[in-house]
Curated annotation (Swiss-Prot):
Family classification: Belongs to the sulfatase family.
Modification after translation, per record: The conversion to 3-oxoalanine (also known as C-formylglycine, FGly), of a serine or cysteine residue in prokaryotes and of a cysteine residue in eukaryotes, is critical for catalytic activity.
List of residues binding Ca(2+): 46-47, 86, 353-354
Organism: Macaca fascicularis
Protein name (record): Arylsulfatase L
Protein keywords: Calcium, Glycoprotein, Golgi apparatus, Hydrolase, Metal-binding, Signal
Annotated catalytic residues: 86, 147
Modified residues (3-oxoalanine (Cys)): 86
Amino acid sequence: MLHLHHSWLCFRSWLAGMLSVLLGLVPSASSNISTSRPNILLLMADDLGIGDIGCYGNNTMRTPNIDRLAEDGVKLTQHISAASLCTPSRAAFLTGRYPVRSGMVSSIGYRVLQWTGASGGLPTNETTFAKILKEKGYATGLIGKWHLGLNCESASDHCHHPLHHGFDHFYGMPFSLMGDCAHWELSEKRVNLEQKLNFLFQVLALVALTLVAGKLTHLIPVSWTPVIWSALWAVLLLTGSYFVGALIVHAGCLLMRNHTITEQPMRFQKTTPLILQEVASFLKRNKHGPFLLFVSFLHVHIPLITMENFLGKSLHGLYGDNVEEMDWMVGQILDTLDMEGLTNSTLIYFTSDHGGSLENQLGRTQYGGWNGIYKGGKGMGGWEGGIRVPGIFRWPGVLPAGQVIGEPTSLMDVFPTVVQLAGGEVPQDRVIDGQDLLPLLLGTAQHSDHEFLMHYCEGFLHAARWHQRDRTTWKVHFVTPVFQPEGAGACYGRKVCPCFGEKVLHHDPPLLFDLSRDPSETHVLTPASEPVFYQVMERVQRAVREHQRTLSPVPLQLDRLGNIWRPWLQPSCGPFPLCWCLREDGPQ
């Protein structure tokens, strides 16, 4: 027996030695990471629903290029945006922090930046991952949508410009696409402004007529001065109501290259080729790396600008055409990487800034996305349909192909992940809410580092998620929007559901869902149906209190003072509103 035991010990020692030698000869993924810094390509869609993509369950929309990323990489199925609208979500993405920390929220209903000529924007004291990567020697570029502010005190100070937030190069829209850019019926601003101007015109016209009648009949002792002024203002308001659509197009629908306006207003038939041309140029120019390129697609936000060769090709109308065109754009970018020999040295990430819009509807025609099995959509801070988004990472030879991860992750996680990959350090002077995803992506960790995630609507906490490891994921809703009509799952007749006021419900006790068994949030749990109801509520409430203690008061960038149009802040390539320029000719 002793002889057998001794032989077994010898064999085990020999086996351990051989394994050590073999492991020393075979480089691991983690050792590859430690010895090389990848190029980083971030792709973000605008308003894309998680159910719009083939690899997330859509079998009628053709997205072969995005699907290929998932086949060759890692797909996240519980990937969460920090906000359900673009401005706060993008601020959180770039900084790794809840938007309430940077003040990129509102308390009065102005949930995104409303104008290019507003003073609000991503504060200059916020640190983006682009700033850190630039300091680490990366060439940094942003192509596409910004929508995080531009100017503070003058039309040329560009205090919120991407070039002041760590990007070496910018080409795209400082603002955002909107229905008004194409004079759509689905208008974000024009219709509302026309109604206000017409109302004020009627009031002033009535005042002027009353004063005239009173003066002529000697019933109102008044001079002609107030009569003339009220009549003049009435005429100006009437004129403004007729031209407000054109003013909005010139004010917001423009393209910039770095600090220079290149198109005002934009020629949409050339926009997609221009974006692709710019991406290819950046990749070729910086192929010796390392580089960080953030491609922030204008797709699939209304007015769904689509090239002629994609019109009518999908099974889902103009929205489907636009999604399929965006997927084609992804394919063109992947082809450029292949041609430049950059595929294996580039980490690619694909996502959307939030869920698809359900309220983008005219008659029976839907112009917004599909959020699959998840309740709600764009603008709803708590429901999964507004915040659960695609999340795909691909890095050939490093990340396992075809991997699917169901752990809770966040858009905010991109910040610490790319900073770590670049050899940088996450700031220690502020709270960073994102977590490094590398251990999860590589398979060296089985669980997400997010135990809790908070779900805000503007500055109001609507819900919280508790990931109870090895058990389940709980979701607690404190506030939910009132759907119109009741049970419709959306707020039809409005642009988005509100965050506060009469059109929301405050729940006491809060609503509880088990997302692991009920991802569609259809079965509300009660103390009678869930034995640990009170324990879950107590633990989540405690986590909320702990989170709130980490918040500090900051100026709200999206409130009224920072979110009104100021003529002296309006970027223009000529005297506004008589501005028109075309400084670059796109592909023919």
